[in-house]
């Protein structure tokens, strides 16, 4: 007879760990299955952790989790080939106030979180691939793994196995991910002495800086670049839609190398030692690409469900929140003695709709399509903004009114009046 659990969680990333932790802590018999050698083994890169989402699951997590730096400064750069126009926000952590965001090293963070999951009572088995879901009368009743005698039964299965979610796709629970809905991000870890990092970014102690980059660095493809400060390293990377990489014939590695040579980026990395490289798929199709998230005996959360806010570059908080809402739905049904059927699990979808997750994704639901069909936001406008800034700031004896007329003429020449008005309307609608 196959072994039976109350719940099986497929995946040991942020969403899977949250779900497994809460279910096990509530007394359920939980099995967590992970493909990697250990949780986090496939994620060597740095990332952003949103403390509020984690603290709703593990109070006082800031004192326990292996955080790198608290982010006190956010920089956003709109770039052409040689310059950028940007905006900065820098705050301070007042006495008694807790930081909201931290940089982390996923390999370290995931291992810590996995230990908390096991301490809560869940059984973790690594280096195990779920090859398919077991079904009976159209209901999911467990999983089959690649191990000998790998059939395992459960009352409920939580799918948190990443962006491709091969298990859900193979079992017909969701369609295959489309190339226009997923981005490929490549990242490097550049190691520097702590003192040099703090000097270059004007920070001290455990304070950190995040830089997000848009514009010509993606060579007309929909995507962004980024740079995060860790304690003794800098995470730097760039990501674009898979469909764009295929169409343009550009190597992600070359795109990253070109970005690192940009005059604004190169000095920040000078003298560093590259020790780690990784590539990662990110679901960026937004609200319109989210599949069915529940069914007979199963729910899906995290990247598996496409829960990423690409406009605000948020992922880990959505992953943890969806994992929490999935677990809370399961526990509520269990307490009420109700079955994990599709009708009852609809509560999970309702909880998602009531949360910031779906509200934010719905707000920006048109943004992926707008960027896909309006590449001028990534090419023409960065050039125009840079040229306008240079014209205004240059002191050359030309009066400011003439400079303003020259700038307006440049904008109209590149986009036309109708084009400028149309682009403005598109952006307003996308952010409404």
Question: Which sequence ranges carry the predicted segments?
Answer:
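N-terminal FAD cofactor-binding segment of flavoenzymes
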Residues: 26, 36-82
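Short beta-strand to alpha-helix junction loop
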Residues: 95-115, 245-251
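Redox-cofactor binding/interface segments in oxidoreductases and associated redox assembly factors
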Residues: 10, 159, 300
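Conserved Rossmann-like nucleotide-cofactor binding loop
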Residues: 15, 38, 164
């Amino acid at each position: 007879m196959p072994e039976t659990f109350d719940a099986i969680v497929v995946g040991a990333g942020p969403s899977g760990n949250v779900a497994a932790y809460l279910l096990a802590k509530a007394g359920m018999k939980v099995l967590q299955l992970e493909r990697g050698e250990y949780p986090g083994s496939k994620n060597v890169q740095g990332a952003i952790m949103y403390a509020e989402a984690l603290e709703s699951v593990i109070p006082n997590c800031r004192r326990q989790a292996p955080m790198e730096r608290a982010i006190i400064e956010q920089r956003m750069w709109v770039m052409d080939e040689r310059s950028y126009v940007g905006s900065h926000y820098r705050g301070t952590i007042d006495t008694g106030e807790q930081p909201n965001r931290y940089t982390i090293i996923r390999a370290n963070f995931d291992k810590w979180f996995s230990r908390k999951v096991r301490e809560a009572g869940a059984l973790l088995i690594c280096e195990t691939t779920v090859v398919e879901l077991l079904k009976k009368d159209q209901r999911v009743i467990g999983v089959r793994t690649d191990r000998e005698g790998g059939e395992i039964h459960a009352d409920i299965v939580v799918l948190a196995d990443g962006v491709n979610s091969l298990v859900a796709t193979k079992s017909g629970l969701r369609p295959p991910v489309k190339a226009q809905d997923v981005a490929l991000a490549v990242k490097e870890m550049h190691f520097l002495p702590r003192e040099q990092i703090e000097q270059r970014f004007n920070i001290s102690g455990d304070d950190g800086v995040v830089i997000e980059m848009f514009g010509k660095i993606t060579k007309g493809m929909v995507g962004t670049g980024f740079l995060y400060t860790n304690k003794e390293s800098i995470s730097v990377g760039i990501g674009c839609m898979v469909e764009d990489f295929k169409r343009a014939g550009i190597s992600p590695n070359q795109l990253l190398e070109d970005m690192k040579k940009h005059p604004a980026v190169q000095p920040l990395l000078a003298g560093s030692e590259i020790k780690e490289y990784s590539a990662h798929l990110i679901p960026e199709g937004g609200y319109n690409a989210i599949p069915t998230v529940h069914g007979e005996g199963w729910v899906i959360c995290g990247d598996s469900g496409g829960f990423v806010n690409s406009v605000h570059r948020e992922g880990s908080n959505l992953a943890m929140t969806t994992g929490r809402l999935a677990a809370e739905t399961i526990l509520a049904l269990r307490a009420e003695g109700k079955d994990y059927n599709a009708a009852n699990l609809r509560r999970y979808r309702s909880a998602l709709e009531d949360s910031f997750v779906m509200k934010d994704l719905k707000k920006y639901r048109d943004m992926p399509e707008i960027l896909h069909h309006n590449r001028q936001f990534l090419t023409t406008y960065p050039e125009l903004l840079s040229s306008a800034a240079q014209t205004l700031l240059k002191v050359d004896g030309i009066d400011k009114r003439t400079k303003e007329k020259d700038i307006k003429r440049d904008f109209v020449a590149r986009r036309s009046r109708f084009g400028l008005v149309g682009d403005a309307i598109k952006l307003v609608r996308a952010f409404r």
